[in-house]
Amino acid sequence: MADSDSYLKWAACLLADLPADWERELAVVRTPIVPSPLQIAAAVGEGPLPPVLSARSLRRTAQRTKPDVIVVACTGPVVDVLVAEVLDEVRPRPVFVTGLPGISVPATDKAWLFRSGCDLFVVHSEREVAEFGEVAGRLGGGGLLGLARLPFLRGPVPPGFEPDGRERDRVVFATQAKVPRAREEREQVLLALAKLAERRPDLDVVVKLRALDGERQTHNERHPYQRLWQDLGEPGRLRFAAGSMDEHLSLAAGFVTVSSTAALEAIDRDVPLLVLEDFGVSAEMINLVFAGSGLLGTLDDLADGVFRAPEQEWRAANYFHPAAASTWVSRLGELLGGERPPPRSLLDGPVHAAARRRARLRVEVPPEVLRLGYKTKRRLARVLR
């Protein structure tokens, strides 16, 4: 079960990696960040479209089907409340699997705390295993760690492949909701892309959007790129598009981002890329993992069309380990066949009860009703000042 666009893509790909004789079912949890039908279709690719279910419907489905495993592919507070409250009476108790849908370096205490009630936490590199192992040892609680290749990393397209007979002439900028945060920084990126488009008329320069105007995504975006471009007066030849990243990369001659996990998809598809360092390389910019990768560069590099390939040593330590090194399916088998007691959630108890109640509202109350309630609360607060 997934609650947002990025988690849905991760869940759909992860389920596809399970043994062929396992029965699988995918569902979307109805929350305020539920993906749109177009986002759902892009996330699951050619697979069947999953239903969007309320928490109550999810609970009834789990009680009826009695699954052996439930993959809780959701944002942290939703993982916690689903496992601790919504699904806690499903019997026999399933193995709860969780994880993060992309780059998780540096490992954070918060990510572990919210998921500490799950039996298996899936991570995607040797570095993440080490970092979350340190967090687990320090905080306690939680279940096992399992290593997996990021499930949407499938290898490069065959040499000479040209989808629909087209050449690779696209430069793809993968946007993110959280970084860079400042309006001025986002405008700088757009202007550098516009310079590239002006200097290289042979290239199709595309701003790849996570969500169209009005659609929700995992994190709220304060300054959407398309609106900024309109505010700037559209001073150049840029194209804005949503849809599947896989489709965009199949046509890409270059790729650029501040820190998107899609950079790993570009590496996987042998697309030259650039990770912008103009706004810093730090945990706050979510790009610390790219230090030492050989991929960091500047807005000037972008305007000049300079893209790079990663250092091989960095690649092996970060997300591109051999498939044989993955442990998550074997760890899952151990949990299914063993008598390991359920893990202890570090958020049980009165200290976190109020936060858990708020999370429960997000999964129980229809999003439009919840938004109306929040709006009414803000209005009352202004009146009562």
What are these regions (language model features)?
Residues 254, 270-277:
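Structural loop-to-beta junction motif characteristic of Rossmann-like glycosyltransferase folds
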Residues 38-115:
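Extended catalytic core of nucleotide-activated donor transferases of GT-like folds
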Residues 218-268:
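Donor nucleotide-activated moiety binding/catalytic core segment of transferases
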Residues 23-33, 122-125, 206-210:
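Short internal beta-strands
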Residues 90-147, 153-154:
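Active-site-proximal region of nucleotide-activated glycan assembly enzymes
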Residues 287, 296, 300-385:
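C-terminal amphipathic helix plus adjacent low-complexity
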Residues 1-69, 381-385:
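N-terminal pre-catalytic "stem/leader" segment of glycosyltransferase-like enzymes
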Residues 10, 153-226:
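Conserved catalytic-core segment of nucleotide-activated headgroup transferases in glycan assembly
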